[in-house]
Amino acid sequence: MTVHFIGAGPGAADLITVRGRDLIGRCPVCLYAGSIVSPELLRYCPPGARIVDTAPMSLDEIEAEYVKAEAEGLDVARLHSGDLSVWSAVAEQIRRLEKHGIAYTMTPGVPSFAAAASALGRELTIPAVAQSLVLTRVSGRASPMPNSETLSAFGATGSTLAIHLAIHALQQVVEELTPLYGADCPVAIVVKASWPDERVVRGTLGDIAAKVAEEPIERTALIFVGPGLEASDFRESSLYDPAYQRRFRGRGE
């Protein structure tokens, strides 16, 4: 018996990986967070599968589901939104599984920041403008941020910031980053990336709070901050330079 942790992607059901889809189809038990994982993914479950919405459940209750499935010899598909590597809360589940000696696998998914960048129609790394992307958040109810991991510390690098789980703290974002990036620095907020009701709010650190106040956003939003978001007059990379192609890629005769 194995618990398969599966990154279910940012929202749209057709953005799940082929491996993730196939694993769902092979598992007689499926656990998913109904509050953030698309119910359309459940159509990949095999007939008669036991489907459990973990949204209202505690970690102890989820652990009990794993133990029950292990006793029955049933593989479990455990769906988490986005990708498992960041803010998935799988670490504490894995610790519980290891306590019981239950095997597990991890299958990556399309992360929310990638879907949000697609919604913007932008590459996030622009030659000579922005070559680093920081994925971060602010302190919240689920867990505090380490003292050294502040918006100000990351903003001091000048990198493009992808700030997750922070729409409730937009004013804090503006206040901490404006002295570092300037009031005219581009900001883009992507709400429910890849979902049918996806929307984008664009502005600057100087006016984004007022724009959001006109159309309030409650949750499931990602805030991008950085000059690369609007850069158009930038140098081209050497990737397609003929000399680069000859040396590193090879060229057909």
Swiss-Prot record:
Q: Which UniProt keywords apply?
A: Cobalamin biosynthesis, Methyltransferase, S-adenosyl-L-methionine, Transferase
> Which EC number applies?
2.1.1.133
Biological or metabolic pathway of the protein: Cofactor biosynthesis; adenosylcobalamin biosynthesis; cob(II)yrinate a,c-diamide from precorrin-2 (aerobic route): step 4/10
What CDD domains does the record tag this protein with? Answer: Precorrin-4_C11-MT (cd11641)
Q: Which InterPro entries match?
A: 4pyrrol_Mease (IPR000878), 4pyrrol_Methylase_sf (IPR035996), 4pyrrole_Mease_sub1 (IPR014777), 4pyrrole_Mease_sub2 (IPR014776), Cbl_synth_CobM/CibF (IPR006362), Siro_Cobalamin_biosynth (IPR050161), Uropor_MeTrfase_CS (IPR003043)
* GO molecular function terms listed in the Swiss-Prot or TrEMBL record: precorrin-4 C11-methyltransferase activity
Return the Pfam families for the record: TP_methylase (PF00590)
Q: Do the record's keywords include S-adenosyl-L-methionine?
A: yes
The GO biological-process annotations, alphabetized, read as: cobalamin biosynthetic process; methylation
Recorded catalytic reaction(s): these are:
precorrin-4 + S-adenosyl-L-methionine = precorrin-5 + S-adenosyl-L-homocysteine
Say yes or no: keyword Oxidoreductase present.
no
Taxonomically, which superkingdom? Bacteria
Family named by the database record: Belongs to the precorrin methyltransferase family.
NCBIfam families named in the record: cobM_cbiF
What is the protein named?
Precorrin-4 C(11)-methyltransferase
